[in-house]
């Protein structure tokens, strides 16, 4: 997106914006990362089309503004623009399959959000002893089927980025949950960071946030 200014607007967290941020980082695209506090959100909300975050504001050289909404649609758009959705129809399917599997895990994680602590702990226990292990095993099987070291072949795709964003959310719920299990997921992250120094640097330097 040469000549364009890209602003990613979200709260001060990883959340639904992280796959967008990581896609831009992995593609080597500069962007402005605007993080909004919950206190400031009510006065900023009317300025965002649809009043929802994340949103991306793209301003061209002539000052024309384009708003982009819906987190995964934005991430897919950016990934496609920068050749990160697979090189063949088969790879595209594999990318989308892994995104779907990761989103199934994300759906479970979302059940814990905005809940009182006692209820959150109860839900966390239920999902980590229920659907999440099943879903993670499905992801491991998909990773085993890759023709390369990454999620789909040897080039970074959106599947890699959505996956590690979701795995970080699982770790947020229980820091030791993945320890000694799911070797394919651990190896995938190791291979991804080795394949993309830009992404490795971003992850090591990004601010610690609760979500």
UniProtKB/Swiss-Prot annotation:
Tissue: In the adult, expressed in excretory epithelial cells but absent from the caecal epithelium and flame cells. Also expressed in the tegument and its extensions into the parenchyma. In the schistosomulum, expressed in the tegument and associated structures. Not expressed in digestive tract, reproductive organs or muscles (at protein level).
EC number(s) on file: 2.5.1.18
Keyword Lipid metabolism listed: no
Family matches, as Pfam families: GST_C, GST_N
Domain called GST N-terminal: residue spans: 4-86
UniProt superkingdom: Eukaryota
Modification type N-acetylalanine: residues: 2
Catalytic activity: RX + glutathione = an S-substituted glutathione + a halide anion + H(+)
Class of this enzyme: transferase
GO biological process: glutathione metabolic process
UniProt keyword Cell inner membrane, yes or no: no
Subunit structure, interactors included: Homodimer.
Annotated function: Conjugation of reduced glutathione to a wide number of exogenous and endogenous hydrophobic electrophiles.
Family stated for the protein in its record: Belongs to the GST superfamily. Mu family.
Stated name of the protein: Glutathione S-transferase class-mu 28 kDa isozyme
Gene name for this UniProt entry: GST28
């Amino acid at each position: 997106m040469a000549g364009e200014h890209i602003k990613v607007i979200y709260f001060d967290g990883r959340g639904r914006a992280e796959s967008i941020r990581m896609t831009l980082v992995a593609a080597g695209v500069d962007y402005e990362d605007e993080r909004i506090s919950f206190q400031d959100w009510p006065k900023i909300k009317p300025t965002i089309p649809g009043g929802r975050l994340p949103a991306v504001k793209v301003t061209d050289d002539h000052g024309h503004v384009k708003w982009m909404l819906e987190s995964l649609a934005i991430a897919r758009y950016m990934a496609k623009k920068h050749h990160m959705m697979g090189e063949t129809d088969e790879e595209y399917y594999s990318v989308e399959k892994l995104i779907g599997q990761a989103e199934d895990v994300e759906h479970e994680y979302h059940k814990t959000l905005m809940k009182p602590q006692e209820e959150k702990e109860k839900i966390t226990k239920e999902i980590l002893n229920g659907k999440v292990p099943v879903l993670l095993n499905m992801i491991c099987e998909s990773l085993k089927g890759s023709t390369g070291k990454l999620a789909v072949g040897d080039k970074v795709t959106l599947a890699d980025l959505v996956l590690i964003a979701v795995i970080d959310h699982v770790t947020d719920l229980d820091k030791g949950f993945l320890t000694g299990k799911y070797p394919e997921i651990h190896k995938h992250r190791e291979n991804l960071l080795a394949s993309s120094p830009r992404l490795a640097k971003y992850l090591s330097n990004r601010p610690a946030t609760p979500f």
